[in-house]
């Protein structure tokens, strides 16, 4: 008789989620670098949440980037997972990031929020300026 419960091998743990999140962020950061972006920060944590990536765009905008890793595009993809509540949180976090990094970052463009949908084979979609 097996010494584990059925389905135990499929249990998602915080460590697994973090590892998958890191993989998605690594793939997104590589994609951004190839596209001419400069990644300025990763995993900016506050009590309000986390910004996945902050990058200066080739046009000198400052982009606050939410990375969504999904194993299948059939579930609506990562972009569909970012609704109004998540956008409000990202805007709050962006303001906090700017307060803490005001001296160290220079950009001549605007501010925006992007979403990058990542799957097992890499970046599927990059939506610029969702806000």
Swiss-Prot record:
Pfam families named in the record: UPF0102
GO terms, molecular function: nucleic acid binding
InterPro entries from the UniProt entry: Restrct_endonuc-II-like, tRNA_endonuc-like_dom_sf, UPF0102_YraN-like
Family: Belongs to the UPF0102 family.
Name of the protein in question: UPF0102 protein jk1180
Organism: Corynebacterium jeikeium (strain K411)
């Amino acid at each position: 008789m097996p010494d584990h419960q059925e389905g135990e091998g499929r249990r998602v743990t915080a460590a697994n989620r973090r590892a998958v999140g890191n993989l998605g962020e690594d793939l997104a950061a590589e994609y951004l670098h190839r596209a001419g972006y400069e990644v300025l920060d990763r995993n900016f944590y506050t009590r309000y949440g986390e910004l996945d990536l902050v990058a200066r765009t080739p046009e000198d905008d400052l982009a606050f980037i939410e990375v969504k890793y999904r194993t299948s595009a059939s579930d609506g993809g990562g972009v569909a997972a970012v609704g109004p509540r998540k956008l409000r949180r990202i805007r709050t976090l962006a303001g906090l990031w700017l307060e803490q990094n005001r001296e160290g970052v220079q950009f001549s463009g605007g501010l925006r929020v992007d979403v990058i949908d990542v799957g097992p084979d890499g970046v599927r979609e990059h939506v610029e300026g969702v806000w």
